[in-house]
From Swiss-Prot:
This protein's UniProt keywords: Chloroplast, Plastid, Ribonucleoprotein, Ribosomal protein
Record-level GO cellular component terms: chloroplast; large ribosomal subunit
Domain of life of the native organism: Eukaryota
Compartment annotation: Plastid, Chloroplast
Listed name of the protein: Large ribosomal subunit protein bL32c
UniProt family annotation: Belongs to the bacterial ribosomal protein bL32 family.
Originating organism: Solanum lycopersicum
Molecular-function GO terms, alphabetical: structural constituent of ribosome
InterPro entries for this protein: Ribosomal_bL32, Ribosomal_bL32_plant/cyanobact, Ribosomal_zn-bd
GO biological processes: translation
């Protein structure tokens, strides 16, 4: 099993953590955008079946 030779510096740790957070931010933004387009009916990639409620 691979063992690190030296301890990772705080700055490098912080940089990696920020990259990880940034990726999560963009994924969440894209998901929110898709949900918004689905709710308004402007989505071109999903077909949503419209159901009408009879009263």
């Amino acid at each position: 099993m691979a063992v690190p030779k030296k301890r990772t510096s705080t700055s490098k740790k912080r940089i990696r953590k920020n990259i990880w957070k940034r990726k999560g931010y963009w994924v969440a933004l894209k998901a929110f955008s898709l949900a918004k387009s689905l709710s308004t009916g402007n989505s071109k990639s999903f077909f949503v079946r419209q159901t009408k409620i009879n009263k």
